[in-house]
From Swiss-Prot:
SUPFAM superfamilies given in the database record: Phospholipase A2, PLA2 (SSF48619)
Protein name: Basic phospholipase A2 homolog Cax-K49
GO molecular function: calcium ion binding; calcium-dependent phospholipase A2 activity; phospholipid binding; toxin activity
Classification lineage: Eukaryota, Metazoa, Chordata, Craniata, Vertebrata
Signal peptide annotation: 1-16
Family membership: Belongs to the phospholipase A2 family. Group II subfamily. K49 sub-subfamily.
GO CC terms of this entry: extracellular region
Subunit structure: Homodimer; non-covalently linked.
Keyword flag 4Fe-4S: no
Annotated positions for site Hydrophobic membrane-disruption site (MDiS): L130
SMART domains: PA2c
Record flagged with keyword Signal: yes
Span list, region Important for membrane-damaging activities in eukaryotes and bacteria: 121-133
Amino acid sequence: MRTFWIVAMLLVGVEGSLVELGKMILQETGKNPITSYGIYGCNCGVGSRHKPKDGTDRCCFVHKCCYKKLTDCDPKMDGYTYSFKDKTIICDVNNPCLKEMCECDKAVAICLRENLDTYNKKYKIYPKFLCKKPDTC
């Protein structure tokens, strides 16, 4: 179980509800979020924002920027619930900040699906030291 949580920390969003984010990514892309996106490119997983390597990596960059805009909640600590109906993610959360967090996660899951054609296996376990200088949102 401890190994699962260590690996789970490598997910795209590290912050927020890792389980919910992982489920969204799996539902939208059909890919395992940990093995496919956990250490992908320069922006998926742990670390700061860098110049994206491709469309998939850009999704993770935008997701980190989305989390940066959150107010009144902590993406590292707070969680949420959502539903998945008719192949659609529904953020049915009453708390405004948790709803924003859910919407950030929904957006990255959809973005990853829309960028499946940009997914490049050479970026799957990409060394961060090869990433260009940090980029701003």
